């Protein structure tokens, strides 16, 4: 399925890793072997999400944009890029939307992001982590934003190009450095 969606002969590997990933340089899609048996929606979600990276995340700029900004910048970049590529994959493959929603529902129920394990309320997370969960899991989880934070959510949701992603990420990272105590502990 992933090769068909990507429209190229990417390599697909199953590994004992915590989450799915795509190596933009070597064109390898990694799917996790999880401790629990995920349903087909979760598998489809992982494939669709990582195919989004295969189709639209450029190798140039992806890794090099991290070095000067600090270790937390890559997490911010990944959150904003994830929102963009998921929006685009849902446009390209409209049938994937339902499976992605179901997959994120299963991930949230399985505590994939570790909030229950850490005893954390989603609204106690920093802005970037709430944006990450909101753009992935939607409105079902009561994620709250101030009026000012809602503007950042909208900026993230409006990204169309990787250049947009870089621009929004840089501004959001600086905003969070000035307004929050943590920018280096984001969830992927």
Regions found by a protein language model. Give the residues of each.
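Short, functionally important secondary-structure microenvironments
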Residues: 1-188
